Amino acid sequence: MTITPESVQQLLNSESFGDRLSGLNKLRQLDVKIAFEMLQPLVTDINTRVRYVAVSQFDTLGQQYLDKSLEVLCDRLLYDAEPDVQAAAADALGGLKLAVAFPHLETRYRNTTEWLVQFSIIAALGELGDPRGFDLLKEALSSDNPLIKTAAVSSLGELGDPRAVALLIPFADDPDWQVRYRLIQSLGRLGGEESQEILAKLAQDEVEQVAQEAKLQLIVHR
């Protein structure tokens, strides 16, 4: 069957949430301008899964419409009732590198107890590359949730602030090998003599994946 704006709109207007999901998945096969207009009403759909999928698509369909994407995504981040949708909004804001959204991301981070939302925000801060995110990432390093802590380690590397090196060094002894692995990647990005020393230490790590990644970073950044 040929996919047309009319056929997709029919799916999006269906009372069946399965049809609406199908319509959302077909939007990427349409002209971006048309698809973006058709996408927007679905972010307030009655069905959580439909809203989640709709919000997630802003990462790709919203590239040419950043102002509108910012408006819609911040609204969903702050006011959607479902943590999954809030997290998807944070992911999309990061993917679109909408640094202007930082105050909204910080507000949501501090006003939620949902780990998934906090995790998505911390991951997004690395993609945003906004220096205002440094203090929040520093705070997240002390999270009791290992996934949030690991995301903070990664995002500090992406942010590129050399002050992060001193904060990250203690994680060379973290019992979770995945934290040490992410640490290596971040130290590789941050560079500097202290980073090289830690990478040399981790090149002898008992976990092969960690040791190999450290050796690779030493070669790339020597």
Segment roles from a protein language model:
Residues 1-11, 30-44, 63-79, 98-111, ...:
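Amphipathic alpha-helical scaffolding segments comprising HEAT/armadillo-like alpha-solenoid repeats
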Residues 111-155:
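Histidine/lysine/aspartate-rich catalytic loop segments that bind and position anionic ligands
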Residues 18-26, 40-41, 48-60, 87-92:
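Non-membrane alpha-helical segments in proteins
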Residues 15-16, 46-47, 81-82, 113-114, ...:
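Short inter-helical turns and helix N-cap capping residues of alpha-solenoid HEAT/ARM repeat scaffolds
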Residues 174-222:
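Long, ordered, amphipathic alpha-helical scaffolds
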